[in-house]
């Protein structure tokens, strides 16, 4: 390292060569030759797909800064767990009929290797959305089904309802993502024999069924007389227990914690009626739900007992919901917990035999703006540097003479100050309030602060730009470059040896 060749008239200043940026760059280049590239088919005994729902690039950057600041650092230099993975790339997320996508079409692409329409789960693009008849004979095989068919162990975890679009695309075929329980089915769907998503989960009969299923959404499995949504009188949790007599059905974090990973057979955990709590809400209000890290850790312990290996899909489903509600605090704290869960998986597995992929299904219209000084609180108001490059003492004022935050949204419900309320969904109870507000006396770092937005909409929208993908283990290098989202399936299938010869 160090100085250029003898015949050069350039000489490096010692400060340049001893700088941590310079040393760090040299170290990365030097380490590259140790990096394993494994092209061999079937080299990954285990495959774990982590999906941060709505975790676009700006979300990753802001979550990285927040996580670093929570540890007392400036934040910008921090790395989330998955950012240390050796390979990364970009993913094009559009659906076959939609420029900015939804979670049903995107997760179908990742799980089945082909893009499809927005709102459609596990069904080819030739089907019409919400038309049962048009979807028949157009079901797509998923990576989870292939793994089950090979005798591998399988798991699906989500902080959203387990019947929600992302987890559903691992096991269900439905031309309408909203058919989560039979109350949502149209007359046409019933007449043509389409089954609701919860029913498909419980009656999943490939291999010995999905081994570990954890998430929210209990209401879609229970009849109305038991507080559920079903109108057919069926209790699908009872049906699951009958089908898996040695299985364990759990409904609380305490019951889940009591499970013995070394001996438990199959597990169905439905921890909430609808979505599970946001992570900050779960912690602040001591809710009896497992964290995503706890669910991930124990699932790997259970699934790794199978000598044939396993396929596991882990969704942080509520990064997306925080953004839809215009709550950066909630989206980012869920993203930090997602990073913690990925760290747990990295610690419990080896890059020799386990492919871990981390990605998002789509982005959100969430921006990191202004010229804040280094280490400025990411949830705070912009404080810029003065003409000598030193931080000012007060927040900057915009041309309207009011301060402004670093983080904001292009559209959505807009500003609200709900103080210490940790449930971002409380925002939906109040009217939209878009445009500029005087934030001088507002604590923008509080859990209940919802950022300003420009275009008034009942919910903030997804965004259409590419999302990141990060990977470690056999086949990870195949995700470098800018690729279609459907490639994710092909990498998992190749590295995991999931496709028959």
Where do the protein language model's features map onto the residues?
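His/Cys-centered metal/cofactor-coordination and adjacent catalytic loops
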Residues: 122-137
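A post-motif C-terminal structural segment
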Residues: 15-26, 40-45, 55-61, 65-108, ...
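Marks the mature luminal ectodomains of secretory-pathway proteins
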Residues: 135, 149, 496-497, 501
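Structural beta-sheet core signal
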Residues: 49-50, 156, 358
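Intrinsically disordered, low-complexity repeat regions that act as multivalent interaction hubs
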Residues: 116-119
């Amino acid at each position: 390292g160090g100085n250029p060749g003898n015949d050069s008239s350039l000489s490096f200043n010692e400060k340049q060569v001893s700088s941590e940026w310079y040393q760090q760059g040299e170290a990365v280049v030097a380490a590259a030759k140790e990096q394993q590239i494994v092209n061999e088919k079937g080299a990954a005994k285990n495959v774990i797909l982590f999906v941060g729902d709505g975790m676009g690039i700006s979300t990753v950057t802001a979550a990285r800064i927040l996580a670093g600041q929570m540890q007392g650092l400036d934040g910008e230099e921090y790395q989330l767990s998955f950012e240390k993975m050796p390979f990364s790339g970009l993913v094009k997320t559009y659906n076959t009929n939609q420029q900015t996508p939804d979670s049903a079409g995107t997760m179908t692409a990742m799980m089945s290797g082909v893009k499809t329409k927005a709102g459609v789960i596990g069904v080819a693009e030739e089907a019409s959305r919400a038309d049962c008849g048009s979807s028949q004979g157009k079901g797509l095989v998923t990576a989870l089904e292939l793994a089950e068919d090979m005798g591998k162990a399988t798991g699906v975890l989500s902080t959203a309802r387990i019947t929600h679009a992302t987890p559903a695309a691992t096991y269900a075929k439905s031309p309408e993502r909203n058919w989560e329980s039979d109350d949502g089915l149209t007359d046409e769907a019933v007449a043509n024999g389409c089954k609701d998503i919860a029913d498909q989960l419980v009656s999943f009969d490939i291999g010995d069924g999905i081994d570990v299923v954890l998430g929210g959404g209990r209401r879609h499995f229970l009849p109305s007389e038991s507080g559920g949504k079903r109108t057919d009188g069926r209790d699908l949790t009872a049906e699951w227990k009958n089908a898996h007599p040695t299985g364990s059905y759990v409904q609380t974090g305490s019951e889940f914690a009591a499970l013995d990973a070394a001996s438990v057979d199959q597990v169905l955990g439905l921890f909430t009626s609808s979505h599970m709590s946001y992570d900050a809400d779960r912690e602040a209000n001591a809710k009896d739900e497992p964290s995503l890290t706890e669910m991930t850790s124990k699932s790997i312990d259970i699934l790794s007992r199978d000598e044939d290996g396993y396929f596991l899909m882990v969704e942080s489903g509520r990064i997306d919901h925080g953004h839809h509600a215009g709550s950066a605090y909630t989206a980012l704290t869920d993203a930090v917990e997602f990073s913690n869960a990925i760290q747990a998986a990295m610690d419990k597995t080896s890059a020799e035999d386990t492919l871990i992929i981390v990605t998002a299904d789509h982005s959100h219209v969430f921006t990191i703006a202004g010229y804040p000084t280094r280490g400025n609180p990411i949830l705070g108001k912009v404080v810029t540097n003065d003409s000598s490059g030193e931080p000012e003492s007060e927040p900057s004022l915009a041309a309207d003479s009011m301060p402004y935050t670093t983080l904001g949204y292009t559209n959505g419900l807009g500003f609200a100050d709900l103080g210490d309320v940790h449930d971002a969904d409380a925002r939906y109870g109040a009217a939209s309030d878009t445009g500029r507000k005087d934030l001088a006396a507002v604590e923008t770092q509080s859990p209940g602060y919802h950022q300003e937005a420009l275009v008034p909409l009942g919910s903030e929208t997804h965004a259409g730009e590419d999302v990141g993908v990060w990977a470690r283990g056999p086949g990870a290098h195949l995700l470098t470059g800018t690729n279609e989202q459907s490639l994710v399936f092909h990498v998992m299938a190749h590295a995991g040896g999931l496709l028959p010869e």
